[in-house]
Amino acid sequence: MKNIKRVSWVASNNVFLEYDIIKKHKLSFDKALNKFGIGEDQLFFLKLNNYGYKIYWCDAVKVTEDTHKHRANLNWLIKRSFRLGVLGHYIDMNIHGRLTGFIINYLKCIYYFSKAFSYIFLFFNIKFQVQILNYFSRFYGRLVGPFVFKKIDFFRK
């Protein structure tokens, strides 16, 4: 099949795998991420990748998902981006260990801040306004993630 690419993680809505792999490594979805409504699959498949299993993605396979109207607005996008920043910190620490994960988290903070700042001169273009807000939200989520992860339980909406 064309367009097959090796990746380190995938979403759980379009995956086939052998159950023996799950049993062998006693893998499960991290319940600490339930309150976010996202991220459980990313962490699960990153662990699978770290065990040496190959994960492939193909853009020729079509997967559809219902559109939720309450998610089709800028406010929801900003909150989701913040959540992704916060849980990104948790995933980095879970995969790489406490110190390395902490360092990676703050390097990603710098990355998201610099991406947002690089678009600041294009602020009058609506497309870039959304991108700037998205990057700043992700930056802020990463920045405060180590301090607020356990306290967040209201962002799942």
Where are these regions (language model features)?
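Short, flexible, basic/aromatic active-site loop/helix in glycosyltransferases
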Residues: 1-8
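Residues that recognize and position ribonucleotide moieties
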Residues: 8, 15, 56
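Active-site phosphate/pyrophosphate-handling residues
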Residues: 20, 43, 62
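Active-site donor/metal-binding and catalytic loop motifs
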Residues: 31-32, 36, 51-75
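Acidic donor-binding loop at a coil-to-helix junction in glycosyltransferase catalytic cores
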Residues: 34-46
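Short, hydrophobic alpha-helical packing/hinge segments within bilobed ligand-binding/sensory domains
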Residues: 44-45, 77, 88
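Non-catalytic, C-terminal membrane-associated alpha-helical segments of glycosyltransferases
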Residues: 79-86, 96-157
